[in-house]
Amino acid sequence: MKNNLKVKLEELVIYILKNIKRYPNIIQRLKFYEQIHLGLTLNKIKNKREIYYNSVSIFKKQSIVDMLIKDTCNKLKCTQSDLLISTTLKGVFYGNITFYKNNKLVHVNLKGTSLIPDMNQIDRIEYTQKKCLIIEKDTIFSKTVREYISNDILFICGKGYPCRNTLLLVNKLNIRKYGIFDFDPYGLEICTKYPSIKKIGIDIKDINLIDKQHFMILNKYDIRKINTLLKQKVYEIELFYMLKNNIKIEIEGLFSAKGFDINNYFYTKII
């Protein structure tokens, strides 16, 4: 497969050089093809960011690399992983979990927070947890894994909008999934990106626990996003509440509330 792709890539380069006037970004293309060809030759996997940072002065922007990846996959009729380009890793997890590829151990995490490995290289995972808690924000994730006492929960953080790699891991988990997100339209939209998840916070009942100094008013972008989500008919109760009260709240407001007990909060929410 790799040798076949190398041949196709070489043929593509020849074609582009013969039709150079049709490709104004020829320098960027040739540099990109060079990196891909080298990766296929050495059987070395790279992610999008590595490709970009190897030639920042040529590519100028990450979006150029993203466009070239998509264009090359279309032209060669292959996938990103066929080109040995891995997904840029962003999400993290906390908990005992083992990852396998072709029955060979690829990654194991026994203690501490770890970056989710490239799930395109994983075909089997093993875990003992019965539940999964997905946390929107990295700061809240760090506080939760430090202070929340539980051995049967796997913690995952997508650091905002989850990347495809994070979603691939979540999809492989055959356990109950819960999530906590900001009480704003973007937090709710992020929640919709996760399949089969039960949102446990911030919910409207939690607002009574939060000091009003943490209440923020909606801006025009929030209102625009709310209207977009309402058209999708998701979380309508929360969205109408935000509009009616002109309010949004970050998770930090809940966690800093007077008398807030993180163990009691999650114990009553995660069942």
UniProtKB/Swiss-Prot annotation:
One of its GO terms (molecular function) is DNA topoisomerase type II (double strand cut, ATP-hydrolyzing) activity. PROSITE patterns: TOPO_IIB. Residues 1-92 form the Topo IIA-type catalytic domain. It is found in: Nucleus. Mg(2+) binds at residues 136, 182. The active site is at residue 53. SUPFAM superfamilies: DNA topoisomerase IV, alpha subunit. Pfam families: TOP6A-Spo11_Toprim, TP6A_N. It catalyses: ATP-dependent breakage, passage and rejoining of double-stranded DNA. GO terms for cellular component: nuclear chromosome. InterPro entries: Spo11/TopoVI_A, Spo11/TopoVI_A_N, Spo11/TopoVI_A_sf, TOPRIM_Topo6A/Spo11, WH-like_DNA-bd_sf. The keyword Ribonucleoprotein does not apply. Keywords: DNA-binding, Isomerase, Magnesium, Meiosis, Metal-binding, Nucleus, Sporulation, Topoisomerase. Required for meiotic recombination. Mediates DNA cleavage that forms the double-strand breaks (DSB) that initiate meiotic recombination. Belongs to the TOP6A family. This is Probable meiosis-specific protein SPO11 homolog. It comes from Vairimorpha ceranae (strain BRL01) (Microsporidian parasite).
